[in-house]
């Protein structure tokens, strides 16, 4: 994979899917599949082969999934694959989008299909004012050319889409925006939720400790979310955990805390951690590292929790 920027598993943990940030050949990026002989153990992976890849060809080499791809998710039933794009240039107007590919059987990405010209299968330009401004996450006061989509996730019913923007340059900052889809997983029905959203970075404030956000994931019950970043200084290679008062609603939340990713055996904490996901049990967490092109696996002592003192009682699980 070229610069892995997203990771996901099937529910059984026997398949791992990796998104390449940029194409190795041709015009479009791709998603690769690996088989795991031991569920959720990435050390047991074997490459499924080029024939099992999903080439992200939507027929548009100008605003399609060609490069700067970030994050991948599946619909709750595994019949839809989603990928995000967010350019890294100084002017990425019309660059931030989410794309949907349909599958003929659950988690079989070799069958991925994008009907050319279908509005259902791609968001409109997420850099438009009406999809960026007016929420609790704040309004960017300069032209929307440096928002930089870096992650996304859906509610279980497919009617909420959460998009993580890393931001770049003066007056741009990391934000999590919440969108409503009036039809489940229909990306053409998108609208911003103005009474929700989280501003994740605010001039180095300890209350919003996320700089250069790079990945997003929600717990299955929608009551927690995590953001990975690899900014500089105090923002270096961290994961922030946020609890939501209402499932899959960012209108009211608590920042539980932030942990620095531990150093691995070779002394590298993952210079460029980006994609983020968990095992079905919540006892393993995974990040991609697009600097060294590998996947890092972490064991957790509490399901879907990385902050000391925030593990729920057994009866709550």
Which residue ranges define each predicted feature?
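Surface-exposed loop and turn segments in beta-propeller and other repeat-based domains
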Residues: 1, 46-64, 113-144, 191-208, ...
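Signature of short aromatic-glycine-proline-rich micro-motifs recurring in repeat-based ectodomains
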Residues: 1-8, 63-73, 137-153, 207-217, ...
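Residue-level detector of Asp-centered blade-edge/turn motifs that repeat once per structural unit
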Residues: 11-12, 76-77, 156-157, 220-221, ...
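Residue-level marker for isolated small/hydroxyl-bearing positions within beta-strands
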Residues: 19, 84-86, 164-166, 228, ...
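Short glycine/acidic-enriched loop and turn motifs that connect beta-strands
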Residues: 22-27, 87-93, 167-173, 231-236, ...
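Short loop/turn segments immediately following beta-strands, especially the blade-tip
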Residues: 33-45, 100-112, 178-190, 241-252, ...
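Blade-level signature of beta-propeller repeat domains, shared across WD40, Kelch, NHL, RCC1
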Residues: 275-310
């Amino acid at each position: 994979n070229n610069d892995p920027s997203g990771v996901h598993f099937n529910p059984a943990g026997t398949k791992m899917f990796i998104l390449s940030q940029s194409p190795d050949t041709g015009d479009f990026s791709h998603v690769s599949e690996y088989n795991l002989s031991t569920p959720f153990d990435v050390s047991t992976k074997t490459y499924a082969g080029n024939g099992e890849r999903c080439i992200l060809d939507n027929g548009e080499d100008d605003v399609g999934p060609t490069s700067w791809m970030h994050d991948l998710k599946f619909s709750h039933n595994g019949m839809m694959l989603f990928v995000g794009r967010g350019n890294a240039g100084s002017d990425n107007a019309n660059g931030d989008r989410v794309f949907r590919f349909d599958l003929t059987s659950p988690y079989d990405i070799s069958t991925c299909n994008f009907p050319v010209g279908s509005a259902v299968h791609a968001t409109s330009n997420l850099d438009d004012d009406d999809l960026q401004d007016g929420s609790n996450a704040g309004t960017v006061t300069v032209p929307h050319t440096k928002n930089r989509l870096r992650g996304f996730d859906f509610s279980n019913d497919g009617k909420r889409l959460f998009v993580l923007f890393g931001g770049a340059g003066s007056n741009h900052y990391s934000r999590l925006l919440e969108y409503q889809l009036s039809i489940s997983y229909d990306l053409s029905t998108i609208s911003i939720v103005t009474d929700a959203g989280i501003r994740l970075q605010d001039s180095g404030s300890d209350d919003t400790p996320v700089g250069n956000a790079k990945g997003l994931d929600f717990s299955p019950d929608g009551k927690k979310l995590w953001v990975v970043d690899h900014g500089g200084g105090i923002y270096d290679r961290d994961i922030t955990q946020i609890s939501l008062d209402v499932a899959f609603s960012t209108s009211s939340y608590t920042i539980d805390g932030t942990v620095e990713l531990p150093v691995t055996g070779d002394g590298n904490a993952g210079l460029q951690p980006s994609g983020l996901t968990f095992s079905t049990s919540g006892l393993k967490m995974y990040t991609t590292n697009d600097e060294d092109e590998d996947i890092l696996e972490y064991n957790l002592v509490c399901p879907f929790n990385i902050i000391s003192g925030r593990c729920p009682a057994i009866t709550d699980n």
